[in-house]
């Protein structure tokens, strides 16, 4: 890779050095910038041809440079001869002006190192094209290397050379003297032009007389650049030292032979023995037959044979050659007409341009682009000719690539886009709009092409508007969306609303209907459909156009009309239009069919929506019910603790002792009945208790209330004395007062993490049993209003002097807690003064009146207390021991295991022991209650 770059660098450096050394110091460089070496030409291909530009005008030129280093091998006088010959040829060319002669734009300039002059832009010499690459750069351009002449180029090129010779012979009275492929130059447009007048001979006779051309004898001692090319020189020039116009015609025949024979001349000449070679050549020419000219086309073969005739008078002259049938080819005639176009009037031009589209497809693209297109675009300056020239230019543009179109055609069309007269220009552009939008760059479309379309829509001519509206749908897909939305559509709508022509209005609606597919759905709904309601006319064609737009929008997959639009705007507009009196039966049927289709879809879509909403509502309703149930359960669980605590402590006097299951109470009642019948008073109290339980059951659950603790009043109170007094009062109960035994069961209470102190007198002693509860915690006591006897002992039967001990049932073991036990009777407790129990009155709130055990056992279960009751059928505690003889009944101890507040996780209680009847206890009750 590096070696390739170095090679390329050296090549570029060498070429630059060659150019610099070739023209350095030459006055030509003051006015022209010399570019790349592209070709070679002139006698012996001694002139190097460079492309260049004029500094002042940036006009493209060709710079011919002769480097004097080429003749360093010659003697000074020989160098001078060569330089003089070259100068003479350029000076003669500069004086002559003809379309078939190379045009000189800057005369010859000489410097110490070179000769240089400038001409019209040049492609190459005919010798280069035919394969002679002498004096060309080492890297030959592919344009020259791969160049192949088309038949039309060859025909018209030879015709041009013939016309050039005709001009020299007839008008100038001059013999060229060296007509060779090296002296035929192909310019940038492909035209063949003559140069190399180094050996031209002018007539020595006055113009009114027969021309006579003096001839110099061939001097083999002169340098080759001082002699014409003998391979194309007529035999008489060497053998008889005569020169006339027929000599140039022989040279033309030799050139024609070389063109059709891949650049090889008809005879090879030995320059060392020129006379012998020409003598042999003369014999061959005299016997020249058609078999020797097989490479030449048959239609021109005889004419070439005549041109190569040894007798000069037999050869056709230049004017005759221009008229041979070989040059009557349609392509050659067309190119010839273009070369003489400036001589024609507008009528002749218009007739020629009308027939040109039939000829263009027969011509090669290179010929069209190089020769015809420049001639056509040059006529754009003539407005009257534009309608005739423009179709041909656009036809050529179709065959060009996008790059060629942008480079060669678009710059010439720019001024034409802005021409409004004649009106045919606009029509032609509209008909070829798809071509323009396809090959024109977006910026030029926005700046040049679309403004022309907008002018057509706003043109006063109805025909122009109709044509524009008919053509727009054919290229709508090529227009960018912003331009269509913001510029094209508003002008179409404006043309529809403001025109007085029914045809324009209908065509506007048809145009809109055809370009709907290129528009956005919401733009159609918000802009196009409301516009339809603004159209004032009610002609059937207009109404059907409106219906067509509605139907196209409604049925198109990309567009569609929402049900809101259908119900609110479309149907209210279509239904009144459907009953217009101007509509016939078929048109009315079309309206009704579209309306029914819209109604059907409206019904289907809205029904589907409502069904979906209904399903969603049902699903949401079921979810809401589930959420409410779960919320209710969570609320119950959340409030159960506080509600249960309130109920337990508000009913601590009664509910705490009657919290067993209903089945357990029935078992207790059956046990009571087995032991004996209830008294009337007990039955009354039991009935009241049942009524109270019924009220409690029907009462709404309590909600916890925020309780603001009240600051304790600093007051000294002797709790010990109060407790001792209450304890002493328990021993002095009268016989007529009903005594209540301990509850057969104890209902657990759920723990809330709070503590409370309970003190119980046993054996007439003040004894503290602590279960770990905090006595300072207050509870709301307004939940229940059942009376509690303030003198009741909650953990044993009524206090009597005969009670000596209590049997405590051992409940199941609970983790982290041990059961509370009561010391046996054998342990003598210290005697203390009676305990004042008034403090408990304040602690437990309002007390309830005493009730019997049977009444408590008949109480209906409470839905909250049942949570703390032992399971159905579980054993219950025994009744308290009574009597002075010390009869003792076992009962479950109220300890830490029996307290539900110490087991907040679950409320399952150990199975209580079954109550056993005692005959002594029954007798004591009979004595106690009469």
Swiss-Prot record:
Localization annotation: Cytoplasmic vesicle, Clathrin-coated vesicle; Golgi apparatus, trans-Golgi network membrane; Endosome membrane
Gene Ontology terms: biological process: brain development; clathrin-dependent endocytosis; endosome to lysosome transport; negative regulation of canonical Wnt signaling pathway; pyramidal neuron development; receptor internalization
Transmembrane regions: none
Name recorded for this polypeptide: SCY1-like protein 2
Repeat region (HEAT), residues: 443-479
Modified positions (Phosphoserine) in chain numbering: 658, 677
Function: Component of the AP2-containing clathrin coat that may regulate clathrin-dependent trafficking at plasma membrane, TGN and endosomal system. A possible serine/threonine-protein kinase toward the beta2-subunit of the plasma membrane adapter complex AP2 and other proteins in presence of poly-L-lysine has not been confirmed. By regulating the expression of excitatory receptors at synapses, plays an essential role in neuronal function and signaling and in brain development.
SUPFAM superfamilies associated with the record: ARM repeat (SSF48371), Protein kinase-like (PK-like) (SSF56112)
Gene expressing this chain: Scyl2
Family the entry assigns: Belongs to the protein kinase superfamily.
Organism (species): Mus musculus (Mouse)
InterPro entries: ARM-like, ARM-type_fold, CIK-Related_Protein, Kinase-like_dom_sf, Prot_kinase_dom
Phosphothreonine: residues bearing it: 708
Consequence of gene disruption: Disruption of the gene results in perinatal lethality due to impaired neuronal functions. Mutant animals that survive to adulthood show growth retardation and severe sensorimotor deficits. The neurologic deficits in these mice is associated with the degeneration of several neuronal populations, most notably CA3 pyramidal neurons of the hippocampus, resulting from excitotoxicity. This is associated with excessive expression and activation of calcium-permeable glutamate receptors at the synapse.
Post-translational changes noted in the entry: Could autophosphorylate in presence of poly-L-lysine.
Superkingdom of the organism of origin: Eukaryota
Stored Gene3D superfamilies: Leucine-rich Repeat Variant, Phosphorylase Kinase, domain 1, Transferase(Phosphotransferase) domain 1
Oligomeric form and interacting partners: Interacts with clathrin and AP2B1; the interaction mediates the association with the AP-2 complex.
GO CC annotations on file: clathrin-coated vesicle; endosome membrane; Golgi apparatus
Segments forming domain Protein kinase: 32-327
Chain positions covered by the region annotation Disordered: 658-706, 895-930
Start-end of Basic and acidic residues biased regions: 680-694
UniProt xrefs under CDD domains: PK_SCY1_like
UniProt note on tissues of expression: Ubiquitously expressed.
Record-level Gene Ontology MF annotations: ATP binding; protein kinase activity; signaling receptor binding
Keyword field: Cytoplasmic vesicle, Endosome, Golgi apparatus, Membrane, Phosphoprotein
